[in-house]
Structures are given as structure tokens and as C-alpha cells.
Swiss-Prot record:
Substrate binds at K61, H62, Q63, N64, T65, K86, R105. Residues 1-23 form the signal peptide. SUPFAM superfamilies: RNase A-like. Belongs to the pancreatic ribonuclease family. It comes from Miopithecus talapoin (Angolan talapoin). The record marks H59 as: Facilitates cleavage of polynucleotide substrates. PROSITE patterns: RNASE_PANCREATIC. This is Ribonuclease K6. Glycans are attached at N55, N100.
Length: 150
């Protein structure tokens, strides 16, 4: 039993940063946080676009992809055939056509002085969708997670 406590403590220390990477601000719904992180109707310079996300999380996010489309169009992907997500859940959906995106990657700096580079992309994407919460738009399903870019 004495050996279990240090092992448990080590697991908690290692798990903490992983949990923070996938957390979202609790005053936002998952769909609203998805919109903030991944929908930018017209391209913005990455440092400016990422500052909004970094201000919520209080750290420099290493990588983020913005779709240049409306929330309504991205949410429409949730109505397409469901597929298996990376986490083995069955609530993912693939876009039927590629869309313009900007991939932002951290190049230097520490919060709040984060610096990101930009790469334009035209690709398909896979999103996870869930039923909306009370304050979400009234769609049958709403996007809550960017699962992958193809």
C-alpha cells in the first residue's frame, strides 16, 4: 500500500496538464467554445486570432485550425452520416467538400506574448457533434470538437 501512494501522486501530476489541454471555459458551452476556437468567417492574422483563444486559457496554444465559414455551414456537417471518432465514439461527421482554413502554429513567446505562424489550407475536416445545450443555436446537433483535418 505504501508504494501505491507515490504512484498515484505521479499519475495525478502527469494527468493534470493533459486535462488542461482539453478543458474549455466553463461559462461557455462546448459549441460556443468550438466556434471561438475553430470558426473565423474571414481570415485573420494568426497572432490576432489566437490571442482571443489564449486569453481564455491563459497560455499559448501550440496549434489551432480556423475554418473560414459560418457556424451554420459547419453545423450542417453534423447532419451528415456519422462516423467513428479518434476516441472511438460514434458522433463524428466528415465534411462533404473541402473548405478554406488557416492553420496557426506557435513559433515563440510565452503567454501573453504568443507568436504564431499561419499556413493556408483547403481541406476536408471531421468534427464531433452533440445535442445542443440551452444557450446553443437550435440545431439538432452542434459541433463541439475538431477531430481531424484530411
Amino acid at each position: 500500500m505504501v508504494l501505491c501512494f507515490p504512484l498515484l501522486l505521479l499519475l495525478l501530476v502527469l494527468w493534470g496538464p493533459v486535462c488542461l489541454l482539453h478543458a474549455w471555459p466553463k461559462h461557455l458551452t462546448r459549441a460556443h467554445w468550438f466556434e471561438i476556437q475553430h470558426i473565423q468567417p474571414s481570415p485573420l492574422q494568426c497572432n490576432r486570432a489566437m490571442s482571443g483563444i489564449n486569453n481564455y486559457t491563459q497560455h499559448c496554444k501550440h496549434q489551432n485550425t480556423f475554418r473560414h465559414d459560418s457556424f451554420q455551414n459547419v453545423a450542417a456537417v453534423c447532419d451528415l452520416l456519422s462516423i467513428i471518432c479518434k476516441n472511438r465514439q460514434h458522433n463524428c461527421h466528415q465534411s462533404s467538400k473541402p473548405v478554406n482554413m488557416t492553420d496557426c502554429r506557435l513559433t515563440s513567446g510565452k503567454y501573453p506574448q504568443c507568436r504564431h505562424s499561419a499556413a493556408a489550407q483547403y481541406k476536408f475536416f471531421i468534427i464531433a457533434c452533440d445535442p445542443p445545450q440551452k444557450s446553443d443555436p437550435p440545431y439538432k446537433l452542434v459541433p463541439v470538437h475538431l477531430d481531424s483535418i484530411l
